[in-house]
């Protein structure tokens, strides 16, 4: 289409100049964006790129307050004055440390969850939103679970698991290295899938410009992420 042709012509002449302020949820900022940002800066050296990170609700607030131009969030809730565009698929998994003293099988049921000590992401995080929604499919609530701690980042959860006998709920993208190294193991929660989407988020009516350039660039590179 015309926009795609225009995008490719600008690419050819490397004509993109200006400032692009990104905001991304913690999981996306830590585990998805770094290689993408590096490639983008190499391709568009005249674009002044900046990134802030926080949980998904915080990113949406920053967008509404015009502190950023484009957000990337992982939640399932939608605000009516924002436009959401799908970017990547993700999945949450339950993990324990490889040397945990928890008496836990490799496969459990949702009904087992109230008996297992948990460490979870904080309120306002997309990760907790998705976990709560999955619980509700089995008539379970957070208040019925044994939550030891709510922490502000996945890295904090992984460190907590090293020193505490409990189970964490995190993005599969965040634990790839630990699973390969054998430091963590996945516990399957039977019949409780926790798929989600990472989404771009923009103010309604403010689409275009460098935000659109970044979204197109990310779309072209999404298969390698």
Show where each model-derived region lies.
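A late-sequence structural motif
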Residues: 32, 187-225
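Short beta-strand->loop
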Residues: 83-93, 146, 179-194
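Secondary-structure junction motif
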Residues: 117-139, 208-209, 225
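Short, well-ordered beta-strand segments
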Residues: 19-23, 71, 95, 119, ...
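Alpha-helical linker/hinge and terminal dimerization helices associated
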Residues: 1-13
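Hydrophobic hinge/microswitch elements
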Residues: 55-60, 64-68, 73-74, 136, ...
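Central regulatory/effector-binding core of bacterial HTH transcription factors
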Residues: 13-80
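Flexible hinge/capping segments at coil-to-helix
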Residues: 13, 82-119, 123, 212
